[in-house]
Regions:
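Conserved PLP-binding catalytic core of the aspartate aminotransferase-like
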Residues: 400-404, 414-447, 469-472
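PLP-dependent enzyme catalytic core of the Aspartate aminotransferase-like
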Residues: 2-3, 10, 14, 390, ...
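Active-site PLP attachment segment
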Residues: 215-219, 327-361, 373-378
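Structural motif of enzymes handling amino- and sulfur-group chemistry
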Residues: 373-395, 399
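Conserved PLP phosphate-binding loop immediately N-terminal to the Schiff-base lysine helix
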Residues: 273-286, 301-327
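N-terminal glycine-rich, Lys/His-bearing helix-loop that initiates the first secondary-structure elements
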Residues: 1-164
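Conserved PLP-binding active-site segment of the aspartate aminotransferase-like
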Residues: 280, 371, 430-435, 454-483
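PLP-dependent aspartate aminotransferase-fold enzymes
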Residues: 1-21, 114-117, 151-272, 276, ...
Length: 494
């Protein structure tokens, strides 16, 4: 078989004009010697390139810009047009992507779902296993297997073990939060109906400032990070009033509940991320803030949801907040949601974990889903948890610390271009000075993508990174070097 470089040269020589340069040849050759998944990605790209040229010869002959436009012509993109990746992905293995024009990228921008990279073999094996496809209405050993795996995973560091007794399995993470809102709705009705503890009181919602809990229905109403767009365009948000509290502001949280008592309304639910994924990527909630929230929510009858959809596994190496350092002796929340790392970015799966008290709130008929707890999704969740070894957990923590330390050193080196670094495990970000445009046309994000580093913006003006769980120090240095290059040689705002 031809070498990696020869294969890439062959793809580049036969395709139209490319805009995405990707990693330089020297870098590719250096990583090929240490990471077999890069060679696997290029080998797969060569096969796919030949097949695509047979299937879509005219499309493959187009330049990269025209090719992207042709492919997306009939698709409605949820996000701004100028934040779409500037390339067409053709093959990938591990953290490596190869484009239709032969560029190689290191992917750190998979919205936190690609903890084990692209095409992880145990996950693909679980996903392709022949199944009796049905939902929770048909008992399956796959359901039993994942329930047992979740019980082993959650609470493994605690003397009292797993605090959750029941699990709901849904599709997207946002959907698991939707189910949580139904349960908090049941609780709110019970408490505000005639004879209830908060009878007749108006009902309000609370989350963290900059919090994100999904795009569907009521989860969107709890998502402060997106409220500006919703209120601008949606009639149903015209009269929405979400109470927000700054992360880790204990006094502000106490004041919010004191105001609810004074003004006579009931806070139905308090939703918070243990590590913020959108508003301030990488910022962790402190044990003191959490314990205050747990005490106040219990005192007032509010449902407390911890949204670990993006933070689970990625931030501390553990799926659940209750296993995170500083939280192991604290009382569990009523509900906790997991999704991205748990489904490996390969098949829709989210889990809502329930304590005995919160499980008792569910009422048959208030929610339903065609694919809930289907065996294929269950097996994927089990496979993921089976891949989380002690070494993987430790690497998440160690490399996360290395990333933050090296980004902070880079911030000092660059003298103000990077204004803030936040990070917990492998969810971290660096905020840029306003003279830099973080995303969109002629931005730092776009420049890094064109040069071979996949990244997605977050916060007001930050670059957000979510690398794979087995990332190495060599990869850390690659990313740091590309951030430096983007700041020094990339575009600036204006």
């Amino acid at each position: 078989m031809a070498s990696v470089q020869e294969q890439l040269d062959a793809i580049r020589s036969k395709s139209g004009a490319r805009r995405t340069v990707g990693l330089d040849n020297t870098t590719v050759c250096q990583f090929v010697t240490n990471d077999p998944t890069l060679a696997d990605a290029v080998n797969a790209a060569t096969e796919e390139f030949e097949a695509l040229n047979q299937e879509f010869p005219e499309l493959m002959a187009l330049g990269e810009v025209e090719q992207v436009a042709a492919i997306e012509k009939h698709l409605v993109n949820f996000y701004a047009d100028d934040t779409v990746n500037p390339y067409v992905s053709m093959a990938a293995r591990g953290p490596w992507i190869v484009t239709t024009k032969g560029a190689v990228l290191h992917d750190n921008g998979g919205y936190g779902m690609l903890g084990f990279g692209h095409v992880p073999e145990p996950i693909i094996e679980a996903m392709t296993k022949p199944q009796v496809m049905a939902n929770v209405m048909t008992p399956s050993l796959s359901q039993f297997r994942l329930s047992a795996a979740l019980e082993r995973e959650i609470g493994q560091t605690r003397e009292d073990g797993c605090p959750f007794t029941h699990f709901l399995a849904m599709n997207s993470g946002s959907e698991s939060v939707s189910v949580a809102t139904r349960m908090s709705d049941v609780n709110a009705k019970m408490l505000t109906d005639e004879g209830g503890r908060h009878a007749g009181k108006p009902v309000k919602k609370m989350s963290l400032a900059g919090g994100f809990h999904g795009r569907t229905g009521r989860p969107a109403q709890f998502s402060d990070a997106c409220l500006t767009a919703y209120k601008t365009h949606l009639a149903t948000f015209r009269n929405e009033h979400l109470i927000t509290v700054e992360p880790n502001d204990v006094d502000g949280l106490k004041a919010a509940y004191a105001r609810a008592d004074a003004e006579g309304y009931f806070i139905e639910a308090f939703f918070m991320e243990p590590v913020m994924g959108e508003g301030n990527p990488g910022l962790a909630i402190t044990p003191d803030f959490y314990s205050t929230a747990r005490a106040l929510t219990k005192e007032h009858g509010t449902i407390l949801l911890i949204d670990s959809i993006q933070a689970g596994l990625r931030t501390t190496g553990y799926l659940a907040l209750v296993d995170s350092p500083g939280f192991r002796d604290l009382e569990a929340p009523d509900l906790e949601a997991y999704s991205k790392a748990l489904n490996a970015g390969q098949y829709p799966l989210s889990i809502l974990a329930l304590t005995p008290e919160s499980a008792a709130l569910y009422r048959q008929g208030i929610y339903g889903n065609t694919m809930t707890a289907n065996p294929r999704a269950m097996d994927i969740g089990s496979a993921v948890l089976g891949m989380v070894t002690p070494e993987v957990r430790q690497n998440i923590v160690d490399r996360g610390h290395e990333f933050v330390t090296k980004l902070e050193a880079l911030a000092d080196e660059l003298g103000g271009a990077i204004t803030k670094v936040e990070g917990t495990g492998l969810l971290f970000s660096c905020e840029l000075d306003p003279k830099f445009k973080a995303y969109g046309t002629d931005s730092t994000e776009e420049f890094m993508r064109l040069q071979g580093i996949g990244v997605i913006h977050g916060g007001d003006n930050s670059l957000r990174f979510t690398p794979h769980f087995q990332v190495t120090s060599q990869e850390v240095d690659l990313i740091i070097d590309h951030v430096r290059n983007a700041v020094l040689n990339g575009p600036q705002a204006g």
